[in-house]
């Protein structure tokens, strides 16, 4: 029975991106010798398993592709807030030093199965969940690695409205951080390989074996199309 797991990234789901500016003379309040680090808030996985009537699909359920009867909808969300301190050199020039970065991460998983579905289909969709949660295990370290190089960075800004220019720059850094997080996280190829191994849940390959094989061999075996990961 065909099934589907949908990976949706935060950039397309309205992830909050905030830029904040502390517009004052630069003065460090951090103890001497302490290197600045970004703050990472990694939320627990939010998981729900839901059933539906195939003849009356719930309004909040993602659409099923043709021929599919169930799906695993995994949403990786991220938001970043960036703060800076400014040293103004004249009326139209300033240097902004990045002093604080906070990245918040979330993973929301919903498995949708029709009433009366077989246990085999449920297990297949749960395999997609396992893959998503595997990638999320190290998401905090990934976000920290991406955000860390921006800490302490000094950016020259110019303009007649230095406050607006500073906020624009901080917002762009926040966007760059979340965009890079989405790009590098990338569980899609592993989900595709898992579907190739299991024939989208149609064969009798044991789910735990398929998940383990996909996670181990993705770098050398993933040659599947890049559309609809998790089918």
Locate each region found by the language model.
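Positively charged n-region of N-terminal signal peptides that target proteins for export
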Residues: 1-5
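Hydrophobic membrane-insertion alpha-helices, especially the h-region
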Residues: 8-21
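Membrane-interface motif at the C-terminal end of an N-terminal transmembrane signal
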Residues: 19-31
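Metalloprotease/metallohydrolase-associated module, dominated by Zn2+-dependent proteases
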Residues: 36-97, 103, 150-231
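Early exported N-terminus immediately downstream of N-terminal targeting peptides
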Residues: 99-101, 105-107, 111
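Active-site alpha-helix of zinc metalloproteases
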Residues: 116-120, 129
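Catalytic Zn2+-binding segment of zinc metalloproteases
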Residues: 126-144
């Amino acid at each position: 029975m065909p099934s589907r797991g949908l990976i949706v990234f935060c950039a397309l789901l309205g992830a909050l991106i905030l830029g904040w500016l502390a517009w004052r003379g630069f003065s460090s309040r951090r103890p001497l010798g302490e290197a600045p680090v970004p703050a990472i808030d990694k939320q627990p996985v939010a998981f729900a398993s839901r059933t539906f009537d195939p003849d009356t699909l719930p309004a909040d359920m993602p659409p099923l592709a043709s021929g599919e009867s169930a799906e695993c909808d995994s949403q990786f969300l991220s938001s970043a807030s960036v703060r800076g301190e400014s040293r103004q050199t004249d009326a139209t020039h300033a240097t902004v030093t990045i002093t604080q970065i906070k990245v918040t991460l979330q993973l929301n998983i919903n498995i949708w199965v029709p009433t009366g579905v077989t246990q085999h289909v449920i297990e297949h969709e749960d395999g997609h969940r396992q893959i998503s949660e595997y990638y999320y295990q190290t998401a905090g370290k990934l976000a920290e690695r991406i955000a860390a190089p921006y800490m302490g960075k000094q950016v020259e800004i110019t303009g007649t409205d230095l406050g607006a220019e500073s906020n624009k720059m901080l917002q762009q850094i926040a966007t760059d951080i979340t965009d890079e997080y989405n790009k590098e996280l990338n569980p899609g190829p592993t989900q595709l390989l898992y579907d190739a191994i299991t024939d989208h849940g149609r064969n009798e390959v044991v789910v735990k074996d398929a998940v383990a094989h996909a996670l181990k061999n993705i770098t050398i075996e993933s040659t599947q199309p890049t559309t609809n990961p998790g089918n």
